[in-house]
A protein has these predicted regions:
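N-terminal DNA-binding module of tyrosine recombinases/phage integrases
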Residues: 1-17
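Conserved hydrophobic/aromatic "anchor" residues
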Residues: 13, 33-34, 99, 210-213, ...
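Basic, Lys/Arg- and aromatic-enriched nucleic-acid-binding interface segment
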Residues: 131-162
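Basic, alpha-helical nucleic-acid-contacting "clamp/cap" segments
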Residues: 176, 185-266
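Short, basic (Lys/Arg/His-rich) helix/loop patches that form interaction surfaces
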Residues: 249-297
Length: 297
């Protein structure tokens, strides 16, 4: 285990990504190089504690230069530390971008400036997303994919903000999941407005699959009416006087940060989503909202 909190947070992120074996080896290479760069005091001090600071351009610039020079190799090659190959350099850059995207940060073209944020999807892309979700429903899905599929389907119907989605409860669903009640909280403040929204066949099916998974999880956690719940045991992040945290079982309410994280991780994990989803859930919400306004006129 690394002595640096930022690298320990990176380890957790890598586990959450669920990358394939080949990609995980590449990501582990980057993880090792970043840890060695920190041990050399080659990166900003803030990068030791914060994963976000570790993945900012201020830290990644010197890291990439050191790594490409061969200084961060974990073993010598013919007695020396030669520069890494161009193929390895390209893999490193791709891994860095993947890690940044998993945190909701824009990709970087290191040495060539930032790549702008991916624009909000157009109506055609939203339709393609719905078709992709429908394909998921036709096959077997993990609990995480089942939850994300239901979340995205609800988003396509409601254009709800992440906070509005996070507080949904099972009693906010109509009979046979034919409608969902959502309370709008305007970003600039103002009166809260609630409305019932008719759901699509896609959303009804996706919610049905998720509710079956959710039922078993909630029973083990002694029950909650929140629609979105955690899939695995975790901790509440608060230290007691002895430096310990409270363990939370699976089936506990998923807070807004957890919901957003599930979106970011799922976007990278499941086939077809990276090309269809923007970096942030809020960008998807705006696209859905714009599409709803177009069809209403």
């Amino acid at each position: 285990m690394s002595k640096f909190p930022s690298v320990r947070a990176l380890d957790q992120l890598l586990d959450d990504l669920g990358a394939g074996a080949a990609r995980r080896r590449q990501l582990d290479m980057v993880r090792g190089e970043l840890n060695r760069a920190l041990e050399r005091d080659a990166l900003p001090v803030g990068a030791r504690r914060s994963l976000r600071r570790l993945l900012e351009e201020e830290a990644l610039g010197p890291y990439v230069r050191l790594a490409e020079s061969g200084t961060l190799r974990h073993r010598r090659v013919e007695g020396g530390l030669p520069p890494t190959s161009e193929a390895t350099n390209e893999i490193r850059r791709r891994c860095v971008d993947l890690l940044r995207e998993a945190l909701g940060m824009p990709a970087l073209r290191l040495g060539g400036g930032e790549i702008p944020l991916q624009p909000a999807p157009e109506a055609g892309t939203l339709s393609a997303l719905a078709r992709q979700l429908d394909q998921y429903l036709a096959g077997a899905m993990s609990p995480a994919q089942t939850r994300l599929t239901a979340l995205l389907a609800v988003e396509l119907d409601t254009a709800g903000r992440s906070g509005e989605l996070a507080v949904l409860r099972t009693n906010d669903l109509g009979k046979d999941n034919a409608a969902v009640y959502i309370e709008r909280h305007p970003q600039g403040g103002g009166a809260v407005e609630g409305e019932w929204i008719e759901t699509s066949a896609l959303t009804r099916a996706a919610l049905g699959r998720w509710l079956d998974v959710r039922k078993d999880l909630v029973q083990r956690a002694h029950g909650t009416t929140r629609l979105w719940v955690s899939l695995w045991m975790n901790h509440d992040g608060v230290l007691d006087d002895d430096g310990h945290t409270t363990i939370r079982p699976a089936g506990m309410p998923l807070e807004e940060n957890g919901l957003v994280t599930s979106y970011r991780v799922g976007r990278l994990r499941y086939d077809g989503l990276r090309q269809l989803l923007p970096l942030k859930l809020e960008q998807l919400r705006r696209a859905v909202d714009a599409d709803r306004q177009r069809t209403a006129t």
